[in-house]
From Swiss-Prot:
Start and end residues of each stretch annotated as SNAPC2-binding: 1281-1393
Oligomeric form and interacting partners: Part of the SNAPc complex composed of 5 subunits: SNAPC1, SNAPC2, SNAPC3, SNAPC4 and SNAPC5. SNAPC4 interacts with SNAPC1, SNAPC2, SNAPC5, BRF2 and TBP.
Protein name: snRNA-activating protein complex subunit 4
GO CC terms: nucleoplasm; nucleus; snRNA-activating protein complex
Effect of Q94A: Abolishes SNAPC5 binding in the absence of SNAPC1. Minimal effect on SNAPC5 binding in the presence of SNAPC1
Effect of mutating L1369A: Decreased binding to SNAPC2
Organism: Homo sapiens
């Protein structure tokens, strides 16, 4: 419109106004015109949508009419009606018109700008937009350009759906856009919250604003003052309400969950059409509203949900959510139910699905673009993310799998340097054939510069365990972030190794890569975001590790749990037991019952018990099976029964039942037979494995290729390198594990007890049976004497003239072997027949062997095999061996020296006169004592006599002794068929015996003696406390603590008179002449003819002889009457016997015949079977020291001479020794040293010599370097540790007594004995309730507790009770530990495999195999070395042939001796 025309129009309106108005209404006209102009301007400024459409517009006529109606108002008639007033009014009108014209011009300019901007937008112009805060046109928001593209401009409704759309809607098929579910981002959630608050605020303020506007309009129209004041008051209230609404908090503005909002406005304006209104509403009402519980679901809540949903039939989820009452929405309840519903869980991809996906991708792909969303239509039950994962990770033909080539690694490193370590989607394009997950894993786990490869040190392992405790299993990324230079996969692999997971088993059970089924839900796929590579790798790793984490959860808790759970004693009771034999102990029956063991008939060999599966041929009666013939692959029932020690009491029941039903005979295979088989198998296996390991790799060049062909040589070298790198590690690992398993088997076997197997005849028995003697003969022929530390120790101990020995060897090398002398007599036949009856006695740990068994000597192979390593049991009838036709064997140095000494002794005896022997003492049948050696004026021990220690036996308490490779043990007891033949018991060379007995190793071994003789030996440089405390102090060896008395025994041991002579001390002479047959001097053991010895009293002042004469009277029945009344026994010893039935191999043999032996009558304990005691066995015993207060304060000078302080063995005090001996202040005996010997005072002998002071060549004086014992020959430990070991400071501490109690041997406390004791637990508890009197006895539980309290109250200070309790705990502690161990093949959490290195461990493994080869010789028939009195029965010497220690606490000690690198064989104990 033109401005001039508008001005003209206004002018006309003014004239019309002047004509209408009279002079009195000019003020009112101006006021109304001004208000109308202001209202018009305000109306123009307000948005069109804010106007109230209900108010009709007011026309100018009505407005002027209203004004004319009010002209009679008296207040409007105040202006004068003159021309001057009219001129002034005209000037006012002109100013108003100018203002209106300026405003109109401004509006026209703005309109033109808006038109131009709109035209630019429609034309596609990108110019800057000018916004004045007004609402945008409908075509400027994003929703205008979305579907439907063609819609009505007024209603916004699009065209009707076509036929295709209607068909899809009828079938429920959604559009592609509806299938796309985009994850809500955080900024979108914040925007939704802000939008809801804004919409709510606008809904609350809109009525108030309209009300306020109406009040303002009405106020302007009223003329009454009262109405105006009322309207003003209402306006102020409306403004206050608006102000209160603006001050409402955000939580109040959010409203309820189901409140209605303008979702279309929020979708179009706030979200600009990116989210649909329905999607926004559902997300707000089901997930995002603050009233909805967004915390994790608890297990209790999930269980309640399952129950409530089942009650409602899995329908009406709104009611289910309300009934659940945890502020969960119905959608959340349904979603959680679907997650835990197994029927809705997606399964692995099938081959049909893989084939369909491959076909669809090939048909529908366009170049490199694959329309996964369209393919989803044809893949029922799968979403697009699953298709992407399956195709890109598994089915893509261009995807490479397996090892990475060096070229690929180089490309990967270049791509990482180019794009960084995050953008794996771009990096995969640089490495063709590899996915983003493969590239990421390869780089982070293998190629990263900060990764550390190789072995884990101890610090890293400790840190790994701490981090696993902190974060738990499965959080390997967090663990690796705090563990420097280690990746998550390395931590997982190390944890699996620590948990004992076998890699071979894992490789067999692990599925191939192409069969891995990727299954991820749509929500997880939508949550992956833009980082496709990282999300795929994390999903794949999580799915692969999920079963491993589930399996590893329990092992982790077992490994890292700081708590220790002690199960109830009732859980230890065996669940099953044999119906025919309810309980059978390995060492004898419990509760006084006879030993329930089925023995073969007399004359049959105990070796018949070898099982068929173990390839031990069952020998006929009288025959014997050689352990040499047992193949190395023996893993039959014998090893399994030994390994499955926790169920040893129940397993034989099935075999016995089957054997009884089949009518076959049952054989009780003793432990030593099982050990022989195992040792033979171990030796053969070790030899084979050692040779295979030492053999260099054979050339693999194929025939027909010349040696000069370079291609063939390179191929051969490549094959060798490949075989060396890949195969040697697994080979060494397998050898090492087999070696350790065999050692563990040998160590645990003695605690299993005897094995009962059916007697079956071997179907394929060779025509010519090679006996054990034949095998030993072959080994003796190959025996070589090597110089070893033990041989050096012998030479130092006995001061052997090596040069003279060599000369003697050279002189007698050509001589034929010496035949048995005419004085040799065969043992009585009844002694040979008595062995079968001894097999069933519980006192025997090892079986008797037939008389055809030949004496064995050590088989020395290699430089590390020790000379003088076996103890030997020789039979006096050498003609029996000659009849079988053995070839003559060369004699060893020890045999030649022994023969030389015997010949010299016989020559001297011819010139000697009768020997006078005084006093007689009563001791046990096989007790051998050690008197002290008096010192010479020069300070070195005089060549006095001594008697060797012999491990002694008690009723029902067999002991196991381990044979040492250096002659560490020799037996005193019965042989296989001749129980009356005694073999010499030499002192051990290991710290075991030094700690147990307090004695040092003995010298060479003497010939086998009968029970009527005492084997003695007197080296000049005695060792330890066994010969004299002074000798041990001189050599720096600590004295061992005294023995503790054992539990009482119901039957006293048979005793025989022992004639001892030591003229230096007071004696009481007897008138009974005693024959003496052996005398030990510095030159050796000398036989004395019986007629040449006369027993006469000797004055007390006469000088003592240099030799000690001792003999045992023939039978017990002949001497029982001469014993006289015996003093009451303070305590009968209950000690395990020595291993009487071993097959020792001595390092020195002699053909000197044994004197005639006499059969001893069987004790009553043997007759009834309750206590097994065999005459000839040795019993370590001593008296219980009576409590005394001044015994420790007494000086050594106050002690009586040694001859008056001899202990009483077997609970019998010598008849010639009074209760209180002279010189004992308190009349009681103090605790004695090893084997009951006191700390004896030193005595200086006079210049005179006794009748038996034989002439001998003077021995060379040892120098300072030869006088002291080299502790390095005893043990590889330090000198301080060896001396502590020798001091015997280990064992079970007995409270209130200040002493230690040695552990019991395995034969006494086997698993069978423990299981039998547990089977009688209820009966023992029932009997214990009889101790309680009164009303408490009626209640079983209260009676048991009352009886326990009674025992604690009355016996807590009783020494006998304390000893009995300590003995019981010492007996059954180790079997209880073994009962918790699983057998071979059963995985436990602590079964950590030993790790073997790659190249640096060949020497260690070879040394281990050599040790196993040396340990597994057939001559070694025992596996444990505990002996009564040893404070730690599990300790064994480094020079012995023991496999492993039986004490778990000493595994590390033995491990440091057998190998240089202990870290390669560390175990979690």
């Amino acid at each position: 419109m033109d401005v001039d025309a508008e001005r003209e129009k206004i002018t006309q309106e003014i004239k019309e106004l002047e004509r209408i108005l009279d002079p009195g209404s000019s003020g009112s006209h101006v006021e109304i015109s001004e208000s109308s102009l202001e209202s018009d301007s305000e109306a123009d400024s307000l948005p069109s949508e804010d106007l109230d459409p209900a108010d009709p517009p007011i026309s100018e006529e009505e407005r002027w009419g209203e004004a004319s109606n009010d002209e009679d108002d008296p207040k409007d008639k105040t202006l004068p009606e003159d021309p001057e007033t009219c001129l002034q009014l005209n000037m006012v009108y002109q100013e108003v018109i100018q203002e209106k014209l300026a405003e109109a011009n401004l509006l026209l300019a703005q309109n033109r700008e808006q038109q131009e901007e709109l035209m630019r937008d429609l034309a596609g112009s990108k110019g800057t937009k000018v916004k004045d805060g007004k609402s945008l046109p409908p075509s400027t928001y994003m929703g205008h350009f979305m579907k439907p593209y063609f819609k009505d401009k007024v209603t916004g409704v699009g065209p009707p759906a076509n036929e295709d759309t209607r068909e899809k809607a009828a079938q429920g098929i959604k559009a592609f856009e509806e299938l796309l579910v985009t994850k809500w981002k955080n900024w979108e959630k914040a925007l939704l919250r802000k939008s809801v608050v804004s919409d709510r605020l606008q809904r609350l303020l809109q009525p108030k604003l309209l009300k306020l506007e109406y009040l303002h309009q009405k106020q302007s129209k009223v003329s009454s003052e009262l109405e105006r004041q009322a309207l003003e008051k209402q306006g102020r209230e409306a403004e206050k309400e608006i102000q209160d609404i603006n001050q409402l908090p955000e939580e109040a503005l959010l409203g309820n969950r189901l409140d209605s909002h303008d979702w279309e406005k929020i979708s179009n304006i706030n979200f600009e059409g990116s989210r649909s209104a329905e999607e926004i509403r559902k997300f707000w009402q089901n997930s995002e509203h603050p009233s909805i519980n967004k915390q994790e679901w608890s297990r209790e809540e999930e269980e309640r949900l399952q129950a409530i949903a089942a009650a409602h039939g899995h329908l009406e989820w709104q009611k289910i959510a309300e009934e659940l009452g945890t502020s969960r929405s119905a959608f959340q309840c349904l979603q959680k139910f679907q997650q835990h519903n197994k029927a809705l869980k997606r399964k692995e991809w099938t081959e049909e699905e893989d084939r369909m996906l491959t076909q669809l991708v090939q048909e529908m792909r366009v170049g490199s673009h694959i329309p996964y969303r369209r393919i989803v239509y044809y893949m029922e039950g799968r979403d697009s993310m699953q298709l992407i994962y399956r195709w890109t990770k598994s089915l893509d033909p261009g995807l490479k799998k397996g090892y990475w080539a060096p070229e690929e690694d180089a490309k990967l490193l270049q791509a990482v340097a180019k794009y960084g370590e995050q953008d794996w989607f771009k990096i995969r394009e640089e490495v063709p054939g590899r996915s983003d997950a493969q590239c990421r894993d390869r780089y982070l786990r293998r190629l990263h510069f900060s990764l550390k490869k190789g072995r884990w040190n101890l610090k890293e392992e400790e840190q790994l365990i701490e981090l696993i405790e902190k974060y738990g299993v499965g959080h390997w990324a967090k663990i690796a972030s705090e563990l420097p230079h280690r990746s998550g996969s390395q931590c997982l692999s190390k944890w699996k190794i620590m948990m004992g997971k076998k890699q071979g088993l894992r490789r067999r059970r692990r599925r191939a890569r192409h069969s891995v089924r990727w299954s991820s839900t749509s929500s997880s796929g939508s949550s992956s975001g833009s980082s496709g590579g990282s999300s795929s790798s994390s999903s794949s790793s999580s799915e692969e590790d999920e079963p491993e984490q589930a399996q590893a959860g329990e092992g982790d808790r077992a490994l890292l749990s700081p708590q220790y759970m002690v199960p109830d004693m009732d859980l230890w009771v065996p669940a099953r037991q044999s119906t025919s034999q309810p309980w059978r102990g390995g060492a004898g029956a419990w509760l006084g019952g006879p030993a329930a063991s089925l023995s073969p008939p007399k004359g049959s060999s105990a070796s018949q018990g070898g099982s068929k599966e173990a390839s031990t041929t069952a020998a006929a009666p009288g025959e014997e099976t050689s352990p040499v013939q047992v193949p190395a692959r023996a893993h039959g029932p014998v090893p399994r029964s030994a390994q499955a020690s926790h169920s040893a009491d129940t397993r034989p029941a099935g075999a016995e039942k089957q054997a009884l039903e089949g009518g076959r005979r049952l054989l009780t295979v003793p432990v030593e037979t099982v050990l022989r088989v195992l040792r033979a198998n171990t030796a053969a296996r070790s030899c084979t494995q050692k040779e295979q390991l030492r053999q260099p790799p054979l050339p693999t060049s194929s025939p027909g290729v010349s040696s000069g062909d370079s291609v063939a040589r390179s191929h051969v070298q490549w094959l060798r390198h490949r075989a060396t790198q890949s195969g040697q590690r697994r080979w060494r690992h397998a050898l090492h594990r087999r070696l350790l398993n065999r050692r563990l088997l040998l160590a645990v076997t003695p605690w299993v007890g005897d094995v009962v197997v059916p007697c079956t005849q071997a179907s394929q028995r060779p025509a010519v049976v090679q006996t054990q003697a034949d095998g030993l003969r072959e080994q003796l022929q190959q025996a070589r004497l090597a110089s070893t530390p033990v041989f050096t120790l012998f030479t130092q101990l006995f001061h052997i003239d090596t040069a003279g020995c060599l000369e003697v060897v050279r002189e007698r090398k050509a001589l034929p072997p010496r035949l048995p002398q005419a004085g040799a007599r065969d043992p009585p036949v009844h002694l040979l027949q008595a062995s079968s009856s001894a097999q069933s006695t519980p006192g025997h740990l090892f079986p008797n062997v037939p008389a055809q068994e030949a004496s064995k000597s050590a088989s020395h192979k290699g430089s590390r095999r020790l000379a003088s390593s076996r103890v030997e049991r020789t039979l006096p009838q050498a003609s029996l061996l000659a009849s079988t036709g053995p070839r003559p064997k060369p004699k060893t140095v020890s045999e030649l020296l022994q023969e030389k000494r015997l010949q010299e002794a016989r020559a001297r005896e011819a010139t000697r006169g009768p020997v006078v022997l005084p006093s007689q003492l009563l001791v046990s049948s096989s007790v051998i004592l050690q008197p002290p050696l008096p010192h010479t004026p020069h300070g070195r021990p005089a060549p006095g006599p001594t008697v060797l220690n012999v491990p002694l036996s008690g009723p029902g308490a067999p002991a196991a002794a381990k044979p040492g490779t250096s002659g560490s043990w020799q037996e005193a007891g019965t042989s296989a068929k001749d129980k009356r033949l005694s073999t010499m018991q030499a002192l051990p060379l290991a710290p075991v015996f030094s700690e147990a007995e307090g004695t040092a190793p003995a010298a060479s071994q003497a010939p086998a003696l009968g029970p009527g003789q005492i084997s003695v030996s007197c080296p000049e440089s005695g060792l330890g406390q066994s010969q004299a405390p002074a000798a041990s102090r001189k050599q720096g060896l600590p004295e061992a603590p005294p023995f503790l008395p054992a539990a009482p025994s119901p039957t006293p041991l048979p005793v025989q008179p022992l004639s001892l002579t030591h003229i230096g001390g007071p004696h009481v002479a007897t008138s009974v002449p005693l024959p003496v047959t052996w005398v030990l001097t510095a030159q050796g053991l000398l036989p004395v003819p019986v007629p040449a010895v006369v027993s006469l009293p000797r004055p007390a002042g006469t000088p003592g002889p240099a030799g000690l004469l001792a003999t045992l009277l023939p039978p017990l029945t002949e001497t029982r009457a001469a014993q006289g009344p015996r003093a009451p026994a303070l305590s009968s010893s209950w000690q395990p016997p020595a291993n009487m039935n071993r097959e020792p191999e001595p390092s020195c043999r002699t053909d000197t015949p044994a004197p005639p032996t006499h059969a001893l009558s069987q004790s009553p304990a043997e007759a009834d079977g309750s206590v097994a005691f065999v005459p000839g066995e040795a019993q370590v015993a001593r008296e219980i020291p009576e409590p005394r207060t001044s015994s420790h304060a007494d000086p050594p000078e106050a002690e009586p001479p040694w001859s008056g302080r001899l202990p009483a063995f077997g609970g019998v005090i010598p008849a010639t020794e009074p209760r209180g001996t002279p010189g004992s202040p308190s009349g009681t005996q103090e605790p004695r040293g090893p084997l009951g010997l006191e700390k004896l005072p030193l005595r200086q002998p006079g210049p005179e010599k006794g009748a038996l002071d034989l002439e001998k060549p003077p021995l060379p004086q040892p120098g300072p370097e030869k006088g002291a014992l080299d502790l390095g020959l005893l043990s590889q430990e330090g000198e301080a540790a060896t001396q502590q070991w020798l001091g015997g400071q280990r064992g079970v501490r007995v409270p209130l007594l200040g002493s230690r109690l040695p552990y019991q041997p395995p034969a006494l406390c086997s698993l069978r004995a423990l299981s039998g004791l547990l089977l009688h637990k209820k009966a023992l508890e029932h009997k214990a309730t009889s101790l309680v009197v009164g009303g408490e006895a009626e209640r079983p539980a209260g009676a048991l507790q009352a009886s326990l309290g009674l025992v604690r109250g009355q016996l807590q200070d009783n020494p006998a009770y304390l000893l009995l309790r300590a003995r019981f705990l010492a007996a059954f502690t180790l079997p209880a530990l073994l009962a918790t161990l699983a057998p071979q093949g059963v995985r436990t959490t602590l079964s950590v495999p030993s790790r073997v290195g790659s190249e640096s461990e060949d020497e260690d493994l070879l040394s281990e195999l050599e040790l196993a080869d040396r340990d597994g010789q057939p001559g070694c028939t025992t596996a444990t070395c505990p002996i009564q009195g040893a404070p730690d029965s599990g300790k064994c010497s480094a020079s012995s042939c023991l496999d492993t220690s039986n004490d778990p606490d000493d595994l590390d000690v033995l491990r440091t001796r057998h190998a240089r690198h202990t870290r390669k064989r560390r175990r979690l104990v």
